[in-house]
From Swiss-Prot:
PANTHER family: UPF0210 PROTEIN MJ1665, UPF0210 PROTEIN SPR0218. It comes from the Bacteria. Gene3D superfamilies: 3.20.70.20. This is UPF0210 protein Csac_1314. Belongs to the UPF0210 family. SUPFAM superfamilies: PFL-like glycyl radical enzymes (SSF51998). The lineage of its organism: Bacteria, Bacillati, Bacillota, Bacillota incertae sedis, Caldicellulosiruptorales.
């Protein structure tokens, strides 16, 4: 049950601290839609998505009106399409991608994920064909999101697919160059990808998730920052306790939305993702929380320490507020989506190397990083390999969403607008990892994988 006091606190957090729910995401299984005939699969898929998500926009609007709580995005996550299209030609795959995008537009769904593949071990020809279709799929759509999982702690790392993905990302950038290579913002590479992630671009409906489920992603960095503004001289343990209490309140709001959305749509409740997700708005920034904790500028020494503390406190507070938690659950540090992170880059305090260190203690990884358009494909692959290694050897989810902005050089600005924000093109290490990446093969799982 939710008390009147909790609802009043939620309303106050909305008014004073930019609290919102980042997304209600409906996960939908497409296994019963599969067919060797592409058009039949598309028709079946369309009926299934309309059945479960046809009323998503209206229900989200109802919840906004009922609680005065903004819901930023309405999203859908599908069974990984690569699992259902083994026999399809390249052209058939693009028809499926276009059909998914058209359904999303028709239902006014902001983003739809699941044009995805998992390639932990062998990189077979069917999967290679599917991954090769991603650049054209993203270039010809507006709302479709795509992801590839290249390793797990139990399976190791697939360097063959990582080597290919450097070229895929360059190709996406080239094919969406008229929009500052925006297609790359809808593609992410994962290690240990969760099956119930409500956030894009990496959301898909995992094979064990049932016919459908609702997952909710919270936001609320502004709430935490505002609470810390009253703790200027507090000890670090008091800071930790304050963050934990605020995370509890934010997550209760997410649980409230999850409960009502489940009832209104008649879809089982999935999880609340305990992630603080920033927006480009001033005062809604993870970087500003870290600076409120005591950093002069995010990216300076102490940033990894402060972020680790924030991440752990958010999880502990959130876990008390919702029984079913999952997804990515932590603090997000997407550069272009966080006005404070952008300022850190512009000031020269926040580098790619420091971001990589910070990703070892928080949710996801190198996210919404804009790099020069002439970066070599092997350098992108090596960025991915570094980040995936952090995930595999620390048994956590990590990811890379990098934008090699076509025609842009270091220091230029790219503006995606909306939630994706803007960023300066960051400097990169120009030494070549080509010989390492071209070795290919599989990296065995680490010894911590032997847990039975």
């Amino acid at each position: 049950m939710f008390t009147s006091q909790e609802i009043i606190e939620t309303i106050n957090m909305v008014k004073q601290s930019n609290l919102d729910i980042r997304t209600i995401t409906v996960g939908i299984s497409l296994f019963d839609c599969s067919s060797d005939i592409p058009q039949r699969f598309i028709d079946n898929m369309r009926k299934k998505i309309i059945k479960y998500a046809g009323n998503l926009k209206n229900v989200a609007n109802e919840i906004e009106d009922m609680f005065g709580l903004p819901i930023v995005n309405r999203r859908v996550a599908l069974t990984p399409i690569s699992l259902l299209t083994f026999s399809y030609s390249y052209e058939d795959l693009l028809k499926v991608a276009l059909a998914i995008d058209e359904i999303a537009k028709e239902l006014e769904i902001d983003l739809i994920g699941g044009y995805s593949a998992s390639v932990h071990k062998n990189y077979d020809e069917n999967t290679k064909k599917f991954i090769s279709s991603i650049p054209d799929a993203l270039a010809s759509t507006d709302r479709l999101c795509s992801s590839v999982d290249v390793g797990t702690t139990r399976s190791g790392i697939n360097l063959d697919v990582i080597a290919h993905l450097g070229h895929i990302i360059k190709d996406i950038a080239q094919k969406t160059k008229d929009k500052d290579s925006f297609g790359c913002a809808r593609f992410v590479v994962f290690a240990n990808a969760p099956d119930d992630n409500p956030f894009m671009a990496g959301a898909f409906h995992g094979t064990g998730e049932g016919d459908s489920a609702i997952n909710v992603g919270i936001s609320g960095p502004g709430v935490v920052k505002r609470a810390l503004e009253g703790k200027k001289d507090a000890s670090i343990d008091e800071v930790y306790e304050t963050i934990k209490k605020m995370a509890f309140k934010i997550t209760r709001a997410g649980q409230l939305v999850l409960k009502y959305a489940s009832e209104r749509l008649n879809i089982p409740m999935g999880i609340v993702d305990l992630s603080l997700a920033p927006t480009p708005k001033i005062g809604d920034s993870i970087a500003e929380i870290l600076e409120e904790m005591g950093l002069e500028k995010v990216g300076g020494y102490g940033s990894t320490f402060a972020l680790a503390l924030l991440n752990d406190a958010v999880k502990k507070g959130g876990a008390m507020a919702a029984s079913f938690t999952g997804g990515l659950s932590g603090a997000f540090i997407p550069v272009s989506e966080d006005s404070g992170m952008v300022k850190g880059v512009e000031a020269g305090a926040l580098s790619l190397e420091k971001l990589e260190a910070m990703t070892s203690v928080c949710s996801v990884g190198l996210d919404m990083i804009v790099v020069p358009g002439d970066v070599e494909a092997e350098v992108i692959s090596a960025m991915i390999a570094d980040e995936i290694a952090i995930g595999i050897y620390n048994n956590k989810t990590t990811a890379v969403r990098v934008i090699p902005a076509y025609g842009k050089k270091e220091g230029d600005e790219v503006n995606f607008g909306g939630l994706l924000g803007r960023s300066k093109v960051m400097s990169i290490n120009k030494s070549s990892p080509k010989r390492l990446i071209e070795r290919g093969g599989r990296v065995p799982p680490p010894v911590i994988s032997l847990r039975n």
